[in-house]
């Protein structure tokens, strides 16, 4: 007995084989353990409001500091910390990502409220709670200078301060003005 395949049958077999191989690869890739980031503590000046950033891999930056197994990022009054540290990649548990205000040299106040949306409502303008908004990694790239700068950025303030962009500034302008790239 001879089995013959027509061209449409052959294409179906190849397509199914490709789909099976792709699915197998995807499942294998997704089954790897997810890289966990180190704990991070961001310490801001007492009354700081606005955008703040950590720019990584800066030779003239601050060396990485640790406190109780957590990376310490002390944000200066201009809102931008330059650090020699490499960016920590991976996922981080919410309880390992903490934000503080330095009220006195000995006293930190933790900011626990996170605002996850920027919906502009009348209620937002009535809320006087201090929030951390946004956050996440970014990369500034300059192809002419062959330069990539990794950073993390956030905002701190009441909802109205965040919506009104109080002390908001563009990190790209900061990088260019300070010739970091």
Across the structure, where does each feature detected by a protein language model lie?
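Short intrinsically disordered, low-complexity segments
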Residues: 6-10, 23, 32
């Amino acid at each position: 007995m001879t089995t013959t395949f027509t061209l449409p049958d052959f294409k179906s077999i190849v397509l199914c084989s490709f789909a099976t191989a792709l699915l197998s690869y995807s499942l294998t890739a997704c089954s790897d353990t997810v890289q966990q980031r180190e704990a991070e503590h961001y310490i801001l000046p007492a009354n700081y409001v606005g955008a703040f950033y950590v720019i990584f891999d800066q030779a003239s930056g601050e060396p990485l500091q640790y406190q109780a197994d957590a990376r310490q990022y002390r944000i200066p009054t201009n809102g931008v910390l330059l650090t020699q540290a490499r960016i920590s990649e991976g996922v981080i548990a919410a309880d390992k990502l903490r934000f503080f205000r330095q009220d006195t040299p000995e006293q930190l106040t933790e900011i626990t409220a996170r605002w996850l949306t920027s919906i502009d409502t009348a209620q937002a303008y009535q809320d006087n709670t201090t929030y951390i908004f946004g956050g996440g990694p970014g990369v500034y790239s300059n192809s002419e200078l062959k330069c990539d700068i990794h950073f993390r950025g956030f905002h701190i303030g009441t909802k109205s301060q965040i919506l009104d962009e109080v002390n908001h500034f563009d990190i790209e302008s900061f990088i260019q003005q300070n010739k970091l790239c």
